[in-house]
Amino acid sequence: SVGTLKLPDANNVFSKTTYDYEDCNKMLGREGLEKYTLNNISYNKNYRFAFIKVHIDNITEYKDTHGKKAYNTILDIIKETLLKVVEYRGVAGNPDNETEYVVIVKDLYNESELRAFIEYMRSRIIWECKAFDVSFMPLFSIGIGRYPDNGTDFKVITNKLIKATDIAISKGGNRYIIYKEDIHGEL
């Protein structure tokens, strides 16, 4: 969507799209992710967001076997790949620790689009990691919460996102869980 701004006492009018976010080309912290989401919702209450938490299941083992330098390179590859995958559709960040990431993507209107995006994201990360080190096959536990499907409060959706990720990890990892109240319960 586009908003038009006219400054008082000015002859100029300019438009700015809500897709344009000054920090979209870097990893954000918790505050940046929340600010991005709340700003976009204030522009358009009809936005649909997918909150995707990506936990790399086997990254610690990779660090133990390949060392800190290779581990840091893999983390950089994952960050760069997430930013490329998201592009103009949202933002990415790692608010909790260096091995878990949160991606917030707009305008995935149904579950098939969401699943396709997740598979695309996983494939790109695997491809880029294997280009660096063919021996590393990243495994993912992914939790997904959705706005407005899982609520309209940022903290509630974040808690559901965390619960979905915990469920994926507890089931043995290397899977994704889309949080659904009728299956996973209310928080």
Model-derived features with residue positions:
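C-di-GMP signaling machinery
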Residues: 2-23, 30-31, 43, 148, ...
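A short glycine-enriched loop-to-beta-strand structural element that forms part of the catalytic core
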Residues: 50, 96-106, 132-166, 174-181
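A general structural signal marking secondary-structure boundaries and capping sites
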Residues: 41-44, 125, 129, 172
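Conserved long alpha-helical elements within nucleotide-processing catalytic cores of c-di-GMP signaling
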Residues: 17-50, 57-83, 93-98, 102, ...
